[in-house]
Amino acid sequence: MRKTIIAGNWKMNLSLKEAVFLAHSIREKIPSISKDKVSMVFPSTLHLENVSKILEGSSVIVGAQNCYHSGLAAFTGETSPDQLKEIGVKVVMVGHSERRQFLGESNFFCNDKIRFLLKNEFTVLYCVGETLSERESGKTLEVLSSQIREGLKGIDSVFFSNLILAYEPVWAIGTGKVATPSQAQEVHSFIRKEISGLFVGASSISESISILYGGSVKPDNIQDLLKEKDIDGGLVGGASQKISSFAGLF
């Protein structure tokens, strides 16, 4: 049975004081209401250690928004998985639309990260999704297929148990356009089928992978989304940055 996951992406938001306050609030409230859902938070890199210490021993998992695919080395400005392990972080987000769009991260670059992280016993949250122009030109499935096949190329089947996917309809974020639960379900179903075709025996593996929806998830739409067969949770931005709205997702 697939896990239902609510993952809060704090992005480059919150001061240290705000992040610490939110982490304490999450520790106090979320474990008691999460029930059968897995809760995750992804603070900014500078706040990871503080938040990890606060949530240590709770059911809330702390993840990193990014890292580089290398051990300790001369990569100025980057963070190594080795450094993340030191502070208890074992989940890393890869391929978020903002990193693809603004920092030029390609499917192949994401693949390098994913393979390195999985081999080093991390769980990976891999984000895929199409832009507004790609959707309006009818390229949604083509784009997603490339992101899945190129991003997950060469990954051994034994590592797929540590893989989570998230679908981000970039066209529905900050554009005034809204993806309906049925539109999201259609794409999630396609993603699952694409995974099932990656290698022999992948069909059963694809059925066990949680696929989250990441298009402006809020307390007032989460339940309708979760009713869909292939939507297994949410990758949440703004609503995860206040305890009232984050708690409303559970």
From Swiss-Prot:
Pathway: Carbohydrate biosynthesis; gluconeogenesis; Carbohydrate degradation; glycolysis; D-glyceraldehyde 3-phosphate from glycerone phosphate: step 1/1
SUPFAM superfamilies reported in the protein's UniProt record: Triosephosphate isomerase (TIM)
Isomerase as UniProt keyword: yes
Gene Ontology BP annotations: gluconeogenesis; glyceraldehyde-3-phosphate biosynthetic process; glycerol catabolic process; glycolytic process
Binding site for substrate: 9-11, 174, 216, 237-238
Cytoplasm listed as a keyword: yes
Disulfide bonds: none
Active site: 96, 168
Localization of this protein: Cytoplasm
GO MF annotations in UniProt: triose-phosphate isomerase activity
Protein name, entry field: Triosephosphate isomerase
Species name: Leptospira interrogans serogroup Icterohaemorrhagiae serovar copenhageni (strain Fiocruz L1-130)
Lineage: Bacteria, Pseudomonadati, Spirochaetota, Spirochaetia, Leptospirales
